């Protein structure tokens, strides 16, 4: 079964605030991507998402991907990277957009894990969501800060 992850870089202040309450963010993004909202409601949801997210650092991502994928059999076409595991055990496609990264994978989880590991090294504030299976979470959990 194919897995489709929508991955956003959340601004640190919101990542800290919503740590442990990711379901609230999941519902917001799910409404945005998977629900037929009325135009006004869609525009409001889009503004909320723009407010809590930051653009993907495209150049930095290219550098990190190339550095970390050098021992992996991968192909690249512009903003798209594709990994195919040996013996057809699985594959994953990584598509960078201005405000989101989509990862589509099937077979073993190893291929998408390679991409998630790269994202973890870039920022602890990436939130990945698979709306079909209702799975979501921080790629590198944001540590709760204790204020005295």
Swiss-Prot record:
Principal place of residence: cytoplasm
Name the UniProt record assigns to this protein: Sporulation inhibitor of replication protein SirA
Role, per record: Inhibits DNA replication initiation during sporulation, preventing overinitiation and thus enforcing diploidy; probably the main regulator of sporulation replication initiation under Spo0A control. During sporulation SirA prevents DnaA association with the replication origin to prevent excessive chromosome replication. Alternatively SirA binds to domain I of DnaA and prevent its interaction with DnaD, preventing DNA replication initiation.
InterPro entries: SirA, SirA_sf
Family named by the database record: Belongs to the SirA family.
A Pfam family per the record: SirA
Stated induction or repression of this protein's expression: Up-regulated by spo0A. Expressed during sporulation, commencing between 90 and 120 minutes after sporulation induction in about 20% of the cells (at protein level).
Keywords: Cytoplasm, DNA replication inhibitor, Sporulation
Organism name: Bacillus subtilis (strain 168)
Localization per record: Cytoplasm
Domain of life, per lineage: Bacteria
Record GO cellular component, one term: cytoplasm
Phenotype of the disrupted gene, per the record: Increases the number of observed replication origins. 15% reduction in sporulation efficiency, chromosomes continue to replicate during sporulation. Both DnaA and DnaD rest longer than normal at oriC during sporulation onset, more sporulating cells have active replisomes.
Quaternary structure annotation from Swiss-Prot or TrEMBL: Interacts with DnaA. Forms a 1:1 complex with domain I of DnaA.
Transmembrane segments: none
Covalent S-S links between cysteines: none
